[in-house]
């Protein structure tokens, strides 16, 4: 079954909470998603929330990570990072776990297929994204990204050929696309701006996938300013 378009819900970005901010009324029955507007890991869960139409059910709590409040570690997440989800009296962290949790525990269109072959391939891709893909591309910034990332981007290109019933990794839009897009979004901007390397050249499936993702308001509302991405990623060079 095709994913139904989520309701259009335009949100104003609230000022992030910092070291001077009081905490929200924790565990008062409100479901809260603690994020940073610029964190790709948090963006995964933010996109999932939006695609499932949960803007009313899950309240965003933006955090200023460079000047984060002490209560983030003391009262919310002992790891002192985002994303973190406050739901049913407990806190859950780690982005790949959270996108599955939100998909399974809240109403809205399912973002993971029932088909066993697709689920198996999806799990392979979810393992690859953080363990190999992200590390490989970040590691290339000190060397030659064109050579050092070719296998990683080719892996993505080939994965997008696996199923022919849609332009996404598993055919239809799924959690796998949500896991990859925050990083590919940033890598595309940074590699083009700094190294003049356009990752979609010679990769038509990747190009088509990015084009489709950019048609989704639920995703585009979460994107990070390109200038910020370039300046932030330069620290890894």
UniProtKB/Swiss-Prot annotation:
Keywords on record: Cytoplasm, Detoxification, Stress response, Transferase
Xref: PROSITE patterns: GST_CTER (PS50405), GST_NTER (PS50404)
Any one Pfam family match given in the protein's UniProt record, by short name: GST_N_3
Domain GST N-terminal span(s) in chain numbering: 29-110
UniProt record, GO biological process: protein glutathionylation; response to toxic substance
InterPro entries according to UniProt: Glutathione-S-Trfase_C_sf, Glutathione_S-Trfase, Glutathione_S-Trfase_N, GSTL1/2/3, Thioredoxin-like_sf
CDD domains in the cross-refs: GST_C_Lambda
Superkingdom of the organism of origin: Eukaryota
GST C-terminal domain residues: 112-232
Family, as annotated: Belongs to the GST superfamily. Lambda family.
Subcellular location: Cytoplasm, Cytosol
Protein induction: By glutathione, ascorbate and auxin.
UniProt: glutathione binding residues: 39-40, 67-68, 81-82, 94-95
Keyword check for Glycoprotein: no
Protein name, entry field: Glutathione S-transferase L1
Entry's EC annotation: 2.5.1.18
A single GO cellular-component term on record: cytosol
Enzymatic class: transferase
Native source species: Arabidopsis thaliana
General function of this protein: Catalyzes the glutathione-dependent reduction of S-glutathionylquercetin to quercetin. In vitro, possesses glutathione-dependent thiol transferase activity toward 2-hydroxyethyl disulfide (HED).
GO molecular function: glutathione transferase activity
Catalytic reactions on record: RX + glutathione = an S-substituted glutathione + a halide anion + H(+)
